[in-house]
Design a protein with these regions (language model features):
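An N-terminal assembly and electron-transfer interface module characteristic of large anaerobic redox
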Residues: 5-8, 13-194
Length: 194
């Protein structure tokens, strides 16, 4: 079933200034998602969003209860096993408009001491204290143990967010992640943006 919104609607909802009126009446909550951005960055982001083509958001109804689903995580936090190839920070330092468009596979039993964080656009100190901030594997394992989810998938995925040119990410990385999710028979994916 196709979604009724568009990607542009979604981006504008998540980044734009909008009003929320949860109940009829005089109380209105104003949400300004740009409030922490300087004026130049704010204008740049708004111009970038305006240039994005409007596309339908694909939507798939869940076919079974969550308690019967296999669940995986995809994080844009650039999380990688210490034993794996690091994300390319050096090229990004030289060209801040570029980010490594590849991905890393993280096993379900990974712990904080097993991984490193390569995202240059966030303070990863909180994730070093608690991996669940960027890759909530322990939390999901607890839900699995409690019968809230069917099972935690064997493999999870991370890529480096802030990808201004998503061509490689869409054409090369995403199909590989989808193949891995299908191989693990994943029913539900938790997307963890940074």
């Amino acid at each position: 079933m196709a979604g009724t919104g568009t990607i542009r609607d979604s981006v504008q909802l998540s980044l734009g200034t909008h009003r929320i009126n949860p109940q009829p009446g005089p109380m209105t909550v104003h949400v300004d998602s740009y409030r922490f951005l300087d004026i130049v960055t704010r204008q740049m982001v708004k111009a970038w969003i305006a240039k994005e083509p409007s596309r339908d958001i694909p939507w798939a109804e869940l076919q079974k209860p969550v308690r019967d689903c296999s669940v995986a995580v995809i994080s844009s936090g650039a999380v990688a096993l210490k034993s794996d190839t690091p994300f390319d920070q050096e090229t990004e330092r030289k060209n801040p408009w570029w980010s490594d468009p590849t991905h890393r596979v993280i096993p379900r039993d990974a712990r904080g001491e097993d991984v490193e964080f390569y995202q240059l656009h966030i303070d990863a100190s909180f994730a070093r204290e608690d991996l669940n901030c960027l890759l909530p594997l322990a939390l999901l394992a607890g839900l699995e143990e409690g019968g809230e989810i069917g099972r935690l998938a064997a493999h999870h995925y991370s890529f480096m967010g802030y990808t201004l040119d998503p061509t490689f990410l869409i054409e090369e990385t995403t199909p590989k992640i989808i193949e891995g999710l299908r191989n693990d028979e994943v029913d539900l994916v938790l997307l963890v943006p940074t």
